[in-house]
């Protein structure tokens, strides 16, 4: 159906049957009559195949009548267009529906610019909304007949007034938004065109020259066709394009039919009122496929292309025409004349090219669909004059044809794709089966994964429960053992000292028995010593010769064991003042026997004393274990993690390993990795000052950063770091079973040189790793308590831990020898720190701090004591300046130590750090060479000395021989 929108009422004609043509006027029910009525211009279509513009004429009722050609389709009848501005804000107009004989009531937007706005058929379709599918009555127009009560008419006018205000505000807002969007698209298009011209400037110039040549050829033929051109209007309007181009109809009558010379006037009074019945097309009247209109290819109900799609099609068509000039004349195939080709300009400026792409919305045939003209459309049509009211804007004729043709191509392409879909049905079904198989496999894998996850969670819960049960049993056993050993070994008892209470250690009955045995051994030793002294006094005069004595004297001496008194006197004075008798001499054999008995008793006492000392030492070890367990159990019961807490749903806390000043170490189990770990929990005291808190956190974070970057077999690994609360956090470390070296030395006091050499060799290996890094690390707190023994004794591997006081030597490699400033002076363990750390102000330190610590540890392992300040506390060491005055180390006579071990200790304990060896020199020391290599080197040196002596002796003999000659 072809329609032309004018400011007022629009009536559309139905189809015409056979060769006869009927003209009728579709009158809409008028609610506003009286003085507001105006002359209604009428446009009438004759139904011919011409693409001429409508001819405007005067009707008897004062309406303007115009005849319009809509093409040789055989389905379009005469159409009369009636225009008036009396309807106010809301106007209704009929429109043909999908059925040829059915009219659709449309709602038109209010006119713009005082009723002077004109719209193209495509734009008009956007501005209308279908109201119903019922046919409307065909009646004559009579201004004197009122069809509504005045009160109802007043209410209707008020509603229309409010609706008009709302529509005006709404459309103004929509126009502003569309104008903004249009300007944005225009700017983007200008940028793209500028880039396009820059990239393809030579090609564009060549393409522009070709249309100029064609225009010159056409200009020669223009005078011949000027008379025919004057009789035709612009055939590229939306009216002609809607009638011929979209239908793609070939010309059947040998060209364009002649335009009627006089308009056929029609009046509303000559037309009788009648109804249009809904009747479907018969098979005889069915339109062939090649003669169908574009509206028959569109889908009803919102399935047609949108305005943005049409604009995109127009943009694509423009690029295709610009790239291929041969496709431009294709617009004239469907009933167009040569005037269209003459009006085509070979070259358009930028403004015309931008205006040619004004947005067009595809009319929808569905019910209750409304189209709104874009600001671009209103701008074009409002700028035209009234004389060219039936023509499209300049340069828009071909664009409308291209638009309709592109829509036709899109709909035909969709039809071809829909026909090709059954051919690919097998492939689609196959792909669907594959997708279903994959979906089923994914579901199976997800179910298996969820099942495995549930099993894993159940296993974790089982492991957790078993570990808790085992730990509870172990805790109970330790408590029972501690309670049983306390009477025998001892325990802590709270005693009062002045106004304070303190825990004091009290020994058990085992130590009391040890003391009794010691007293008995000492008493027996004293008795044997006195008897031995008396025996020496009775020693015979001639040892080896038997003395001559009477038999009676010998028998008396044997019986009494003493010599007779020489001062025996019967007088009373002699009885009062009696002289002690001299010890009688005993026989030689008796003397030898008594002397042998006393010697054996002394040896027996010595053995008992050794056994007693060993038992006492063993009891001391038990006491250390017992005291340690008592403290550990007390700290464990007072800790907040004694309830088998699960940190971060991963680390199960089992039992406390030890507690320091501001941290505690727990043995835990990692249920994710199934391994035992050590969790070091750092506590920040709430009562500390902010400066102290910041300092502690700084050291803890530095320890974490340093420790996490280390990976060596002789260094404890750090696995994780996690936050517990606002005042505590935890570092997860590698768990090392056994004890530390400090605990082992307390039990054994000293170890052999071989065992000490093995431990020091592993420590030096770890220090070499720390110093080979790009930023060397100083441990600064190396001591026996931070050397862990994996097997619990000195015959196994060791690991270094506790990097809380570590330092990083940043900067260039040349600055590492100068050292870094000591920021934590008087921190650490004083017995193992070098003299430079006690100098005020704080000096610069290097990695040789750890070298001094190695020397002290090696000395303590061999000799059982520290080389400096062994019996002093740390406070006394500071008061007496013990370490500052430690300029030379001395070695006890026992035990015997090799010269290589003593030289190693001297190199480590040099007072000046410049004279002290570094870790790389210690690693190459002869102490760490294999024993066979040392013996070979010693043998080689001895052989060299012998050869030198022999050469010297040979030279001396030669000189002696020469002198004799």
UniProtKB/Swiss-Prot annotation:
Homology family: Belongs to the protein kinase superfamily. Ser/Thr protein kinase family.
GO biological process: chromosome segregation; intracellular signal transduction; regulation of transcription by RNA polymerase II
Recorded name of the encoding gene: tlk-1
Coiled-coil residue windows: none
Protein name in the entry: Serine/threonine-protein kinase tousled-like 1
PANTHER family: MIXED LINEAGE PROTEIN KINASE, TOUSLED-LIKE KINASE, ISOFORM G
Residues modified to Phosphoserine: 634
PTM (free text): Autophosphorylates in vitro. Phosphorylation on Ser-634 by air-2 enhances catalytic activity.
Comp. bias (Gly residues): 10-21
Compositionally biased tracts (Polar residues): 42-52, 233-244, 320-341, 365-381, 552-572
Chemical reaction(s) catalysed: L-seryl-[protein] + ATP = O-phospho-L-seryl-[protein] + ADP + H(+); L-threonyl-[protein] + ATP = O-phospho-L-threonyl-[protein] + ADP + H(+)
Recorded GO MF terms: ATP binding; protein kinase activity; protein serine kinase activity; protein serine/threonine kinase activity
GO cellular component: chromatin; nucleus
Lineage of the species this protein comes from: Eukaryota, Metazoa, Ecdysozoa, Nematoda, Chromadorea
Low complexity: compositionally biased ranges: 172-231, 342-355, 382-401
Residues that, per the record, bind ATP: 657-665, 680
Residue ranges constituting the Protein kinase domain according to the UniProt record: 651-928
Subunit structure: Interacts with air-2.
Record EC number: 2.7.11.1
Annotated region described as Disordered, given as residue ranges: 1-22, 35-72, 95-120, 172-292, 320-402, 538-576
Residue positions of the active site: 781
Protein function: Essential for appropriate transcription during embryonic development. May act during transcription elongation to activate the RNA polymerase II large subunit (ama-1) by phosphorylating the Ser-2 residues of the C-terminal domain 7-residue repeats. Does not phosphorylate histone H3.
Compartment(s) where it occurs, according to its Swiss-Prot or TrEMBL record: Nucleus
UniProt keyword list: ATP-binding, Developmental protein, Kinase, Nucleotide-binding, Nucleus, Phosphoprotein, Serine/threonine-protein kinase, Transcription, Transcription regulation, Transferase
């Amino acid at each position: 159906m072809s329609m032309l929108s004018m400011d007022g009422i629009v009536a559309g004609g139905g189809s015409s049957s056979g060769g006869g043509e009927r003209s009728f006027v579709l009158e809409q029910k008028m609610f506003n009559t009286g003085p507001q009525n105006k002359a209604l211009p009428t446009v009438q279509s004759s139904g011919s195949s011409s693409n001429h513009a409508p001819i405007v004429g005067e009707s008897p009722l004062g309406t303007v009548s115009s005849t319009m050609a809509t093409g040789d389709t055989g389905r379009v009848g005469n159409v009369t267009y009636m225009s008036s501005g009396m309807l106010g804000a809301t106007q209704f107009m009929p429109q043909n529906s999908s059925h040829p004989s059915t009219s659709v009531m449309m709602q038109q937007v209010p006119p713009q610019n005082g009723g002077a706005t004109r719209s193209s058929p495509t734009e008009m379709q956007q501005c209308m909304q279908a109201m119903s599918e019922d046919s409307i009555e065909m009646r004559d127009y009579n201004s004197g007949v009122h069809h509504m009560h005045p009160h109802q008419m007043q209410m209707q006018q008020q509603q229309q007034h409010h609706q008009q205000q709302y529509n005006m505000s709404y459309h103004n807002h929509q126009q502003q938004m569309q104008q903004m969007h249009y300007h944005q698209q225009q700017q983007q298009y200008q940028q793209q065109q500028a880039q396009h011209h820059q990239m393809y400037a030579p090609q564009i110039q060549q393409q522009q020259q070709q249309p100029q040549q064609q225009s010159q050829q056409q200009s020669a033929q223009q005078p011949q066709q000027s008379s025919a051109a004057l009789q035709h209007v612009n055939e590229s309007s939306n009216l002609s394009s809607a009638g011929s181009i979209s239908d793609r109809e070939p010309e059947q009558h040998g060209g364009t039919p002649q335009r009627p010379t006089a308009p056929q006037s029609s009046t509303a009074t000559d037309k009788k009122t009648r109804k249009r019945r809904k009747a479907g097309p018969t098979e005889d009247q069915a339109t062939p496929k090649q003669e169908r209109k574009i509206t028959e290819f569109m889908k009803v109900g919102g399935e047609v292309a949108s305005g943005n799609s049409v604009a995109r099609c127009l943009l694509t068509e423009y690029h295709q025409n610009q790239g291929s000039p041969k496709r431009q004349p294709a617009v004239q195939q469907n009933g167009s004349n040569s005037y269209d080709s003459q009006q085509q300009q070979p070259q358009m400026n930028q403004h015309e090219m931008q205006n040619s792409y004004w947005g067009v919305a595809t009319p929808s045939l569905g019910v209750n669909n409304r189209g709104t003209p874009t600001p671009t459309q209103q701008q074009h049509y409002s700028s035209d004059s009234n004389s060219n009211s039936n023509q499209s804007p300049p340069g828009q004729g071909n664009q409308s044809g291209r638009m309709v043709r592109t829509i036709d191509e899109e709909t035909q392409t969709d039809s071809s794709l829909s026909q090709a879909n059954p051919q690919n049905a097998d492939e689609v079904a196959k792909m669907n089966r594959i997708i279903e198989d994959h979906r089923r496999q994914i579901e199976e894998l997800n179910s298996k994964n969820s099942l495995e996850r549930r099993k894993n969670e159940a296993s974790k819960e089982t492991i957790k429960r078993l570990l808790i049960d085992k730990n509870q049993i172990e805790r109970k056993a330790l408590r029972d053992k501690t309670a049983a050993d306390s009477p025998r070994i001892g325990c802590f008892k709270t005693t009062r000292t002045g106004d304070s209470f303190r825990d004091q250690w009290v020994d058990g009955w085992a130590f009391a028995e040890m003391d009794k045995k010691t007293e008995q051994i000492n008493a027996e030793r004293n008795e044997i010593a006195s008897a031995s002294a008396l025996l020496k006094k009775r020693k015979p005069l001639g040892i080896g010769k038997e003395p001559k004595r009477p038999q009676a004297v010998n028998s008396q001496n044997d019986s009494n064991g003493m010599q007779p008194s020489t001062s025996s006197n019967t007088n009373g004075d002699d009885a009062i003042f009696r002289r002690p008798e001299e010890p009688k001499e005993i026989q030689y054999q008796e003397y030898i026997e008594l002397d042998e008995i006393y010697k054996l008793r002394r040896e027996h006492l010595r053995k008992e004393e050794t056994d007693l000392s060993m038992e006492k030492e063993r009891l001391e070890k038990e006491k250390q274990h017992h005291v340690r367990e008592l403290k550990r159990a007390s700290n464990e019961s007072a800790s907040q993690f004694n309830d088998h807490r699960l940190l971060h749903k991963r680390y199960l806390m089992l039992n406390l390993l030890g507690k320091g000043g501001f941290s505690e170490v727990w043995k835990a189990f990692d249920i994710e990795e199934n391994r035992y770990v050590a969790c070091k929990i750092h506590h920040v005291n709430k009562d500390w000052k902010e400066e102290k808190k910041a300092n502690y956190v700084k050291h803890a974070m530095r320890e974490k950063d340093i420790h996490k970057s280390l990976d060596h077999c002789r260094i404890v690994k750090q696995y994780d770091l996690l936050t517990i609360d606002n005042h505590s956090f935890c570092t997860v470390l590698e768990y090392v079973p056994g004890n530390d070296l400090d605990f082992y030395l307390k039990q054994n006091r000293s170890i052999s040189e071989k065992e000490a050499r093995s431990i020091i060799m592993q420590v030096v290996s770890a220090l070499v790793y720390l110093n080979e890094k790009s930023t060397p690390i100083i441990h600064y707190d190396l001591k026996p308590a931070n050397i862990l023994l994996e097997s619990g004794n000195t015959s196994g591997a060791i690991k270094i831990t506790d990097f809380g006081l570590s330092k990083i030597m940043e900067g260039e490699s040349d600055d590492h020898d100068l050292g870094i400033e000591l920021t934590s002076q008087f921190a650490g363990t004083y017995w193992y720190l070098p003299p430079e750390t006690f100098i005020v102000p704080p000096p610069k330190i290097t990695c040789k701090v750890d070298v001094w610590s190695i020397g002290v540890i090696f000395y303590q392992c061999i000799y059982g004591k520290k080389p400096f300040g062994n019996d002093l506390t740390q406070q006394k060491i500071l008061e007496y300046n013990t370490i500052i005055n430690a300029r030379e180390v001395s070695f006890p006579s026992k035990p015997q130590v090799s010269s290589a071990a003593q030289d190693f200790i001297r190199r480590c304990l040099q007072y000046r750090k410049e004279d002290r060896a570094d870790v790389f020199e210690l690693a190459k020391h002869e102490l760490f060479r294999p024993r066979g290599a040392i013996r070979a080197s010693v043998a080689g040196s001895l052989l060299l000395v012998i050869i030198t002596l022999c050469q010297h002796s040979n030279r001396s003999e030669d000189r002696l021989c020469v002198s004799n000659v």
